[in-house]
Regions:
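Solvent-exposed alpha-helix faces
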Residues: 57, 222-224, 276
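Small-residue (primarily alanine) positions within well-ordered alpha-helices
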Residues: 128-131, 192, 274-275
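Active-site entrance/lid segments in N-terminal catalytic domains of soluble metabolic enzymes
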Residues: 1-168
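Single conserved hydrophobic/aromatic residue that forms the stacking wall/gate
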Residues: 270-280
């Protein structure tokens, strides 16, 4: 199948394995690329830029097909050394970068001068248009269905993708709830030129995830996700479990308009205690 996405990234199938923290390692990435899709290493999973350079080199040994690197620009009190991570990407011969999080405009000249094609993750049409304006080559349009961070607009792919098709000139892929051939057909029908899958790839044998987690994902129904961190406007879709239930109880205990720092502190305190209990 040929689309503008397969032509842009020189891949056989318009399927991208999106960057996922602690999942996007070379074993999974190479498997996806060798199968004709586009595998993506997650840069910030690697503790240092040197570790990223080593992971890129390892992946080159496992595939001669195109693969990319995800670089997420996260809001934090102290930014990771993004320039050094980008240097590792460039020196590693990477020609495709998936950006996410904050606006990547600051880093676009450095990436483009190295001949790198950039696909940016967006959860709205307005963000997609901004990505197009700053020179991104493509965008991944993430509907409200997506795992991880779906944004704050709550627009599902059935509405978001056709709107993106109406507005964008650059190619885009659909993301959010994508899992099989039906997903790809629907994405193409809505105007996308491929799809980005994340959670589905966690359930593969190459993903470095415990089999119990993989089985839980496979057995989960469409009713078993929850939205957490909404009061902080950092909404995250997660698979329901006891810890998620506790987080939601903590959120409910804080009245609307109350100090978000207090909510964050309570959530962090709970997760820290839960981690200590789990580790014994």
């Amino acid at each position: 199948m040929k689309t503008r996405i397969t032509e842009l990234f020189n891949i056989e199938h318009p399927i991208i394995q999106g960057g996922m923290h602690f999942v996007g390692f070379s074993e999974l990435v190479a498997a996806v690329s060798n199968a004709g899709g586009l595998g993506i290493i997650t840069a910030l999973t690697q503790p240092t830029p040197k570790d990223l350079a080593n992971e890129i080199a390892k992946c080159h040994d496992m595939t001669d097909k195109p693969f990319g690197v995800n670089l997420t620009f996260i809001p934090s009190f102290k930014d990771p050394p993004y320039d050094e991570y980008i240097d590792a990407i460039i020196q590693g011969g990477i020609k495709i970068v998936e950006t996410a999080g904050r606006n990547p405009e600051k880093y676009m000249p450095q990436l483009k001068e190295a001949g790198i094609k950039v696909i940016h993750k967006c959860t709205s049409v307005r963000h997609s248009l901004k990505a197009e304006a700053i020179g991104c080559d493509a965008v991944s349009v993430d509907g409200f269905e997506c795992g991880g961070h779906p944004g704050e607009d709550d627009v599902p792919n059935g509405i978001l993708l056709p709107r993106a098709a109406e507005e964008l000139k650059i190619p885009f892929v659909a993301s959010g709830g994508m899992a099989n051939a039906r997903s790809l057909v629907s994405a193409l029908a809505f105007g996308a030129e491929g799809m980005n899958m994340g959670t589905r790839f966690i359930a593969t044998k190459e993903a470095p995830v415990h089999n119990n987690v993989k089985q839980r994902l496979v057995e989960a129904s469409e009713l078993e996700t929850r939205l957490v961190m909404r009061p902080l406007r950092n909404t995250e879709r997660v698979l329901v479990n006891n810890a998620v239930d506790q987080i939601m109880e903590i959120e409910a205990s804080h009245k609307e308009g109350s100090d978000p720092n207090a909510l964050l502190e309570d959530c962090l305190l709970y997760t820290s205690d839960a981690a200590d209990e789990y580790s014994g």
